[in-house]
Amino acid sequence: MSRKVFQRKEYSIYRAGDGFIIHNTNGEFVKHHTHIRSFKKAKSIVDLCIRKKLPDKPNIWEIESLMRLTRNNAYYNKLRDLLEGLGE
């Protein structure tokens, strides 16, 4: 069973096994959650989602995690464009 360890706005972070789960509580758990290994990175991802910012040093897994969490279409599209740019 997971235990909530942090919440900021609609984002909850749960301790799960050897990592953490971030869930956007405004969306279905199945569609709007992601798994992260460190608590520090989980909090960073929550902060990026709330401020709708792009990571300074983007990598594929981080962008995909942000895309799974957000329910904002404009932010999702910015993340998708960034992800496509990394694939070139």
Segment roles from a protein language model:
Residues 1-22, 31, 51, 60, ...:
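Short N-terminal "domain-start" leader segments
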Residues 25-41, 49:
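A short, exposed loop/beta-hairpin motif centered on an aromatic-Gly-Thr core
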Residues 44-56:
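Short, surface-exposed secondary-structure junctions/capping segments
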Residues 56-65:
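N-terminal DNA-binding module of tyrosine recombinases/phage integrases
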